[in-house]
Amino acid sequence: PAGSSAFVNTGSGSLRLGGTVTFNVLNDPSTAVIAGTLELNGATRTFAVNDSVAAGAAIDLDVPALISGAAGFGITKTGSGAMRLSGANTFDGPTTVTGTLLLMNTQALGVPTASRTLTVNGASSLVLDGVGIGSANFPLSLNGSGNTLLGPISGALVNMAGNNTVAGAIALAAASQIASLKPGNKLTLAGNITGATFGLTLYGDGDAELGGALGTTSGTLTKYGSGTLTL
């Protein structure tokens, strides 16, 4: 409920989900936490997280819990709030992001099977917080310039801390922005980037490297910030 933070710890057991996980923390400066083990229980599950940034909570829902699931089932993040995944998750279905999703574990997105999809919707951000996406089996679809939850520098894909690599291909489903925020940090995009007529903007004071082919036919490549871009 609004105005009260939550802490859920499954201990040595697990919490078997039967529907949507909803956190309505509009007036709470604290971060809600789910620890232990979560089972997706035969479906792709939605985490609906509202935004309490006005109350001072940079992260609205922190999930260090291990998220497991049968083959083909994943997670959908909805709502304008920020959710952080820091467990070594074992699900292998699709991941869809609305709002902000932060990754703090190299296995936060689960097991890199060949059928994985990773979609960042419009006005939304996928944030790398000290980790990359090391498998090419996570093709990424970007749909815009990100949201403003992280401040004036935003992106559909944001490298917030560390020298990190996104190994998979990136498809631009709209004109999109990628941010490498901090000096001394580097974001490497190792896969090919495609997008027909859509443009790509690289933003921030961190470095960036495009290791694959940039396959837009008439879209523009724009660079802002003091970081170095290597093609």
Which residues are covered by each model-predicted region?
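Extracellular lectin-like interaction modules
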Residues: 4-10
